[in-house]
Amino acid sequence: MTNNYNLGYACINTELSSRKVKVSTNRTMRRKTFDEKGLDYVSEIILQNVTDLLAILKWNADNDIHFFRMSSEMFPWASEYALEDLKDFDKIEEALFKAGLFAEENDIRLTTHPGPFNKLCSPNEQVVLNTIKDLEIHGRMMDLLCQPRSPWAKINIHVGGAYNDKPMALANFCKNFKRLSDAVKTRLTVENDDKESLYSTQELYDGVYKVIGIPIVHDYHHHTMCTGGLTQQEAVELALTTWGD
């Protein structure tokens, strides 16, 4: 019997990260360390992270796992520098190319889920600018991995807040979406929330998908706390319609 689903996991491979020689893409640092040790140290950390990404993908392939959500911590403090300024950029670029090629050759889907501080819907322009910057970093990472500019290589986020005015927040999200580069716009997806004060799959369909056409990622667990009046099956089927073929 052929399965029509694809199981995977997010960010941390507990098998590899617990070994004596740790394999991980989550090496990071505190701000104090970043300020004290500078870009050369950051460059070394990033090179370790992206090199280990390939090792993790090889383990995944060996264990018949073909879906992997990459860590957003692969590039510590990435908003503070341009990747090209890193001393190891050429090696980092090569490592990402190799990882992306391996993923393609082994039918492994790579995705990301930037953190909750990303709020395209915010009425605060600085918050929006910070969000755009972070999303563009994820878009650049996907490009360096040679991933398709499509939701297959999704950059998945939440709307980010309601600000006591859901229509306003949804309109802001859609307006600010248009400020993103194609590297992000073509990959962006939006996920339902786990609080009734935020956004159900139905609300995302009406307020986001119908306006800008980006696919909805339906979280089964979140839906139990924010149904929007739909059953689980109805919400899943509604989200599926946003993905086309």
Regions found by a protein language model. Give the residues of each.
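Conserved, mostly hydrophobic/aromatic
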Residues: 113, 219
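Short, glycine/acidic-enriched loop or turn micro-motifs at the edges of active sites
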Residues: 116, 194, 222
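Catalytic beta/alpha-barrel core
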Residues: 156, 187-194, 215-217
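Active-site segment flanking the S-adenosylmethionine/decSAM binding pocket
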Residues: 209-215, 221
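Short acidic, Gly/Ser-rich segments with clustered Asp/Glu that frequently serve as metal-coordination loops
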Residues: 221-227
